[in-house]
């Protein structure tokens, strides 16, 4: 039986990385820096100081909930209150965002924290305070304890700086959002290939950052430079080189043509190291040509 909860968690992690790329491309400040899982799910920083902390909520199997007593809402508030407890200065000039695929119910605290004409942080605070002091949900008690212990002034200041972005693109649709930023860099038939290379590069950046103890920042100019560089490979008088490396070759896995080439190399008495290099180049060339044919570039 498939574990839908595990699948949804995995999608949530992938969504976090993909949506971070979309956020970076959409940002009006080309010098902005973004980090993943350092200050928060995603964070924008200036001079290595967070100016926007972002929690991402993705729901597929189960419809998300942003009601006043929802887990998504209260768990996030506790995360931010814990961060404020450790670094009180974080409240100075930092915005806190919840970006979710769910919909904020009308007149809920989340609805009143959207960036529109209905925004009313004071009323949102009162709604959350009512839940905090009246709820008997034992699973949420640690969230309510953090709310009460932080003090009214701190919680009110936090809530004034919270912004809810609901009905966000899901993990499939956010790909379309990213493609909108690529389409002006190339002709339409190459958009998907450039997107795939961009996302491969981006996911590697994210993995490297997650494996590093120190915060790793990527700015918008780096991403745009990569898009421009890759797009220049997809022009009428050029064939892109996108097969950059292959795994170690095992003779048992060779195709018939590769075995013939291998035997030919033996006949000219190449050493093992040079033979491996020749086989790797041969295999890369074969895969590269197959890629060009598959993508209709020849």
Give the ranges of each region predicted by the language model.
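Acidic metal-coordinating catalytic centers involved in nucleic-acid phosphodiester chemistry
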Residues: 1-9, 58-298
């Amino acid at each position: 039986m498939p574990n839908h909860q595990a699948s949804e968690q995995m999608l949530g992690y992938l969504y976090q990385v993909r949506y971070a790329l979309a956020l970076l491309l959409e940002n009006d400040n080309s010098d902005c820096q973004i980090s993943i899982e350092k200050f928060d799910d995603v964070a924008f920083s200036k001079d290595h100081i967070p100016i926007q902390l972002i929690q991402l909520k993705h729901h597929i199997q189960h419809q998300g909930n942003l009601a006043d007593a929802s887990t998504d809402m209260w768990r996030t508030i506790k995360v931010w209150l814990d961060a404020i407890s450790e670094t009180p200065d974080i409240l100075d000039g930092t915005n806190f965002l919840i970006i979710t695929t769910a919909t904020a119910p009308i007149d809920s605290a989340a609805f009143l924290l959207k960036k529109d004409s209905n925004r009313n942080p004071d009323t949102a605070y009162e709604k959350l305070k009512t839940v905090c002091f009246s709820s008997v949900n034992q699973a949420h008690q640690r969230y309510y304890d953090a709310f009460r212990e932080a003090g009214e002034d701190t919680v009110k200041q936090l809530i004034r700086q919270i912004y809810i972005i609901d009905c966000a693109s899901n993990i499939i649709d956010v790909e379309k959002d990213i493609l909108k930023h690529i389409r002006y860099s190339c002709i339409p038939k190459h958009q998907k290939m450039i997107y795939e290379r961009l996302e491969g590069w981006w996911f590697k950046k994210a993995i490297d950052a997650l494996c590093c103890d120190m915060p790793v920042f990527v700015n918008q100019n780096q991403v745009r430079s990569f898009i421009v560089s890759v797009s220049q490979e997809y022009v009428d008088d050029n064939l892109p080189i996108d097969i950059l490396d292959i795994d170690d070759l095992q003779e048992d896995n060779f195709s018939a043509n590769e075995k013939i080439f291998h035997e030919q190399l033996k006949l000219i008495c190449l050493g093992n190291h040079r033979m491996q290099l020749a086989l790797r180049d041969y295999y890369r060339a074969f895969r590269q040509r197959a890629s060009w044919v598959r993508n209709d570039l020849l």
